Amino acid sequence: MSQKKIDLVIVTGMSGAGKTVAIQSFEDLGYFTIDNMPPTLVPKFLEIIEQNNDNKRVALVVDMRSRTFFKEITLILDQIEQNFAIDFRILFLDATDNELVSRYKETRRSHPLAADGRVMDGIKLERELLAPLKSMSQNVVDTSDLTPRQLRQVITEQFSSDSNSASFRVEVMSFGFKYGIPLDADLVFDVRFLPNPYYLPELREKTGLDQEVYDYVMKHQESNDFYKHLVELILPILPGYQKEGKSLLTIAIGCTGGQHRSVAFAHRLAETVKKDWPVNESHRDKDKRKETVNRS
């Protein structure tokens, strides 16, 4: 069996250009990530990944900390190319001098290469030292006019191995309004206007996952009309959320107790969405009433 290659992205560039946002984006894409790794430790780390880790997608932030940085990283890149089954790319993040100065003023942090505290001097020195590495980089991104969200979007577009599955998934959940709206919900839909199976004794103890309840909820015209509009709303916007670099979209559907109507709707929606996107289906309050009755 051929050995699976390591997919290595080395994230570097100007201090203040967005490396922290970048490494978080790679983590959302499913990469194994480490921030601020000394170049000399990279080969040993890759050896461990090669032998012991199923995840062969790795992103490392390697910062400029000394004048010997370029010499070190060049030697390391040659070494790993010779000794490992690896595909590696360098992502270089840049920004204009004025933008970098503005960011340092905003955060009130000192530049790592500004010995006398003058940020512009540190930027000029760093730019000079990194120029050869920038010329070697396969991906150069100017973040001067990018928001953090836009930078995440750029990284997603350039490094996601699968635009649907690697970087984005959907959580479809049901809940009961009487227990509170889920705090992590991105989209919330209310189905309390639909006929309630709770008032039918033969359905009261069942849930929306039981066929009898599901059929009762979905047999009404207003249920099917609402579901049609719900799908027409949700499916077209999912690519937009994925494009924005969002890794998880939580869609919450609520009824009064979270046992019947919302469960049926969440299940139906999950079955529809999973045809095109990775989906996790959950029902937060489905058994809450039963648990309350048992405790009383």
Curated annotation (Swiss-Prot):
ATP binds at residues 13-20. GTP binds at residues 63-66. Keywords: ATP-binding, GTP-binding, Nucleotide-binding. The keyword Nucleotide-binding applies. It holds the Pfam family PapZ_C. One of its GO terms (molecular function) is GTP binding. Disulfide bonds: none annotated. InterPro entries: P-loop_NTPase (IPR027417), RapZ-like (IPR005337), RapZ-like_N (IPR053930), RapZ_C (IPR053931). It comes from the Bacteria. HAMAP family: RapZ_like. Displays ATPase and GTPase activities. Belongs to the RapZ-like family. This is Nucleotide-binding protein SUB0630.
